From Swiss-Prot:
Keywords: Capsid inner membrane protein, Membrane, Transmembrane, Transmembrane helix, Viral genome ejection through host cell envelope, Viral penetration into host cytoplasm, Virion, Virus entry into host cell
InterPro entries, per database record: DNA_delivery_prot_P32/34
Membrane-related topology note: Single-pass membrane protein
GO biological process, one term: symbiont entry into host cell
Protein name as catalogued: Protein P32
Extra remark: PRD1 virions are composed of a tail-less icosahedral capsid of diameter 63 nm, an inner protein-lipid membrane, and a dsDNA genome which is located inside the lipid vesicle. The DNA is packaged into a preformed procapsid. The internal membrane plays an active role in DNA delivery to the host cell by forming a tubular structure used for injecting the DNA into the host cytoplasm.
């Protein structure tokens, strides 16, 4: 895996970490909404990255 792959994994891990902290800290957190938002955002980024190839 190249430098780009390592950077991408680092960014995704950081986003997931922030989402986990937000869920833990907030007493009125919408856990399902947070997870859906994170996966939707990741899906959109992945689609954008693969658009020129497909």
């Amino acid at each position: 895996m190249g430098e780009f792959g390592k950077t991408l994994i680092t960014i995704v891990t950081a986003i997931i970490g922030v989402a986990i902290i937000a869920v833990i800290v907030s007493q009125r957190s919408n856990t399902a909404g947070v997870i859906q938002s994170a996966t939707s955002g990741f899906s959109n980024i992945l689609k954008s990255a693969l658009a020129p190839i497909i």
